């Protein structure tokens, strides 16, 4: 694997940076820098800005609107978007649901939904986890019973990310209660405004709103919204989760957060010296940087193989990436000392820029760090708990 920078890739990187400087509004970049949960209008604005450029869905094939980039260009794109503090687009739609639709859905569904996803005309959430079905997803109980040209859906989903913003849900439902757990599941596309569907917020430990619980009470879903074949939904779910776990390494996010820690450590002082000069702190930061670089090279290896074998290492990337994000967030809070624990949300779930701890105001560069560290506790759980991922690694890679 050649790790020397390609001049073409460097030119592409500079093009991305110029685009972000010209197109990203300063107030939006400021919110992104503080790692606020994205506002819906920010998300939609940026998705449409990217779509106008042909960059909204970098991972999609050209035939469905993708830009035709190399794997390395896709990685650089994500890296520069995070470094430039651009808001995340509808990643559930573009990176998870979209690929399922263009791979398994009918031509009519592709024609209807893919353009909407590219332009953020309708945002998406995924209905997988239930109160009794998290890591053991195949035990889900939400039922869908065929009634003429519709399915009647009853049940509950929980931890539904961005459900409060979503217009549509990609949901796993049980259509054959008598079949083996994994064989009686189907995938439905459900309108979040359908009668009988209720979405309720779940405020997490960071006091922000990103997840929800969704209730279905005789919700009628057109049968034409079935993805692929009835009772074949488990295969589509595994495909989707493979993408989620590969993407959850989040190296661009981690590198951006490391740069923020270095900025803080140059300003904050310990024993009269910049914190960055403290040997213990510097060693911890160096260890994180080394581990991040190792993870980045692991991703480069997958990219060099044109993505072959990505599914087999998805669990490894998920485990390493999620644990790194927690370590980085915790170190950032520690760098601020006692002020690092301050959290005060405003009504939109954004972290108040006037956070204080006692009489000591939190500096601008420290706003939201405590909330971020709290939210990062979930990274080792969502997308498949790391304990489950280690079992997958043992079976599929180590052959234990």
Locate each region found by the language model:
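Glycine-rich beta->alpha junctions and the first turn(s) of the following alpha-helix
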Residues: 5-7, 197-295, 379, 395
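A structural signal for short hydrophobic beta-strand segments in well-ordered beta-sheet cores
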Residues: 142-145
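A short, Trp-centered hydrophobic/proline-enriched beta-strand micro-motif
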Residues: 120-128, 172
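Internal helix-loop-helix
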Residues: 44-47, 51-121, 162-168, 292, ...
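C-terminal helix-coil-helix/basic helical segment that borders enzyme active sites and/or dimer interfaces
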Residues: 28-37, 270-273, 293-359
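Glycine-rich phosphate/cofactor-binding loops in nucleotide/flavin-utilizing enzymes
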Residues: 24, 72, 76-77, 96, ...
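A short core secondary-structure module
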Residues: 149-150, 154-200
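Amphipathic, small/basic residue-rich leader segments at the start of a protein or domain
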Residues: 1-91, 112, 116-119, 274, ...
